[in-house]
């Protein structure tokens, strides 16, 4: 699987790379590829409502005070090393300083992020979970929350979040950690059944 910097890539670059990989000309699909790129880029700019109280988005959503206020967001989970909290005097933050690398240990923070999101929900507030682009770190965190909060299997949680935000792509390391998290949740369910 190839990766590109979405801040630098153009639809032409994508088309040429696909042509190279497929060894065929795609000129007649130029408009289609451009439209699909615009859909993906638009999803990345706009936050996605995953649940009535939970939004998944980017650093741009996190710095848009008007949007935050209009959506009743009083809690923010910032899952980045590189983006600082924009409104610490006005909003409640949970800052998880991690990089988007397969070797990054994100699982150890999920109990903390799940509690924080649940607190926002219980207080009748909305919460934004964001990383830089709303694709990997933050989506993994939201998927982990959905699994814990709703008792969903990993596949169901990924499907739900992907249906709401089509551009999510947790890195392979985070997917492995989500599988581990699913296993620990399953063990806890079995333990509860045995002790009741």
Segments predicted by a language model, with ranges:
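Conserved beta-strand elements of beta-rich interaction domains across eukaryotes
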Residues: 55, 61-63, 81-84, 98-103, ...
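Eukaryotic beta-rich interaction modules
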Residues: 32-41, 46-80, 109-114
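Active-site regions of enzymes building and remodeling cell-envelope glycoconjugates
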Residues: 89-99
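Non-catalytic regulatory/accessory regions that flank a structured catalytic core
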Residues: 1-50, 54, 183-196
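Cysteine-dependent PTP/DSP-like catalytic domain, specifically the C-terminal lobe
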Residues: 141-143, 147-193
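Helix-loop module immediately N-terminal to the HCX5R catalytic loop
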Residues: 97-127
């Amino acid at each position: 699987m190839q990766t590109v910097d979405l801040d630098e890539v153009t639809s032409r670059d994508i088309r040429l790379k696909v042509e190279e990989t497929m060894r065929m000309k795609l000129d007649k699909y130029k408009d289609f590829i451009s439209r699909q790129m615009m859909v993906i880029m638009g999803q990345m700019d706009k936050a996605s409502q995953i649940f009535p109280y939970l939004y998944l988005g980017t650093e741009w959503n996190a710095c848009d005070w008007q949007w935050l206020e209009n959506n009743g967001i009083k809690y923010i989970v910032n899952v980045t090393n590189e983006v600082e909290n924009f409104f610490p005097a006005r909003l409640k933050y949970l800052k998880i300083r991690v990089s988007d690398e397969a070797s990054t240990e994100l699982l150890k923070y999920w109990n903390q992020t799940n509690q924080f999101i649940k607190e926002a929900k219980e207080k009748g507030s909305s919460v934004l979970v964001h990383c830089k682009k709303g694709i990997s770190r933050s989506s993994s965190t939201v998927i982990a929350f959905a699994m814990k909060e709703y008792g969903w299997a990993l596949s169901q949680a990924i499907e739900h979040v992907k249906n709401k935000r089509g551009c999510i792509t947790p890195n392979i390391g985070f997917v492995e950690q989500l599988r581990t998290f699913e296993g620990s949740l399953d063990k806890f369910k079995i333990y509860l059944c045995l002790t009741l």
